[in-house]
Amino acid sequence: MSKLQKRLLLTKVKQNRTLSLEHLFSREVKFNMAVSIATSFRTSAKSTSISHNNRTVNDPLKNDKYHKHIDWDKTDKNIILVQRPIKEVYDENFGEAVTQYNAKQKRTDRQVKNYFEKVKKDKTLDLQREFIVQFGDKGLCEEYPDTREAFAFQLEKYADWFRQQFPDLKIYNAVIHMDEATPHLHMNVVPVATGYKQGITKRPSFSKWFKNNEIDFKQFREMQVEKLDELVQEMGAVRKIVGTHEYEKPS
């Protein structure tokens, strides 16, 4: 069992010792166990669109093929959890390591002037990664309209759990879309990996982050699925098995 898995297990044990059934307040929805809810956890190494996620696209683009599925009248109901400039996150997490690296360079042409731009050109590193998390589907939300708020609340809880359990996956943007057929979470993170003996000692690398935490991408995915299953059970339902969760192995 890896260090990360042990920490997650310890956290779960502590929660089980003290947790009484949580009330979802105005967003509480309790299903009969016969109801099954599909969950989805997807990611890829492709570039993201923060303007799409934050709904800051220009008016002419709102009706193009990439945005026609959005109900713009409901966009004000979207829930912004985190919204930070990615360059700010880079400065905060890698700035000191870059400064230390530059101080050791005898030639100024070897110094790194802009680490963010350097990473963008480096195929061995990960500028960022986006996760998309969802409960239910369009049919379920139409059959049980109250589930939209309940799913949003569970997505907030998932994002908070993720932030606490994976502190070196720095969330710089997270928003729950309520203006589409099914509520879902877009969460963008920057992986912070340490342990490099040469060059810059901290770098954005998922493969190195996995190595630091003694897990692989499959185990990481299983942790997410287990948490989503737990959140489904909190609503008195069971997770619907609809196939494998999409996960693209980090490069």
For each predicted feature, which ranges?
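N-terminal nicking endonuclease/strand-transfer module with a His-rich metal-binding environment
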Residues: M1-S251
